[in-house]
């Protein structure tokens, strides 16, 4: 799985970007509107959390500004009748937090505000996901730290790992 792509932003549209890595590989990544709004200018460095979908006819990368958005996307894919395009559409219409809250609170009206989600689909989302979002914690703001105070993280590349305590 390709969990993250970082490099120079060479192209951006409302629904997709292209990132050229330092190794010279360019990745086309499908994104929700919320991710587009936080992108840097063309030519600047960008980093996206990604989810790879392998189909018979294509390999598609979906990218998100935060790991939280990616986790919500992955959970929504587990609902009956929801594919990557609809899940991405949900995150383009609602923030990840609002989507999770709507499902937990069984808010049919909010869910039906998403294009291609009618009453039956909203009910199915609630049925399939209401009890499966309990461990999905919010860290949607770029740079947010969901870990407990004092947690450690590893920074640096291969052979250059540096451990530090979180403030």
Give the positions of each predicted feature.
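A general alpha-helix detector
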Residues: 71-72, 86, 106-110, 150-158
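Amphipathic, charged-and-aliphatic alpha-helical interface segments
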Residues: 52, 59-64, 84-103, 124-137
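Glycine- and Gly-Pro-enriched alpha-helical subdomains that act as flexible
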Residues: 112-115, 125
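A short amphipathic alpha-helix within small helical-bundle interaction modules
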Residues: 76, 91, 99-104, 111-112, ...
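A positional/architectural concept
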Residues: 1-78
């Amino acid at each position: 799985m390709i969990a993250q792509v970082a490099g120079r932003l060479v192209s951006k549209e409302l629904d997709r970007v292209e990132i050229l890595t330092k190794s010279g590989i360019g990745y086309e990544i499908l994104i929700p509107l919320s991710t587009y709004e936080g992108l840097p200018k063309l030519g600047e460095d960008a980093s996206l959390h990604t989810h790879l979908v392998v189909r018979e006819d294509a390999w598609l990368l979906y990218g998100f500004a935060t790991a939280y958005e990616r986790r919500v996307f992955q959970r929504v894919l587990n609902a009956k009748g929801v594919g990557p395009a609809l899940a991405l559409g949900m995150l383009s219409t609602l923030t990840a937090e609002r989507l999770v809250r709507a499902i937990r609170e069984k808010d049919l009206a909010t869910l039906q505000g998403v294009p291609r989600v009618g009453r039956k689909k909203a009910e199915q989302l609630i049925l399939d996901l209401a009890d499966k979002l309990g461990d999905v914690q919010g860290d949607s703001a770029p740079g947010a730290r969901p870990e407990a105070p004092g947690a450690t993280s590893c920074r640096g590349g291969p052979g250059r790992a540096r451990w530090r305590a979180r403030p």
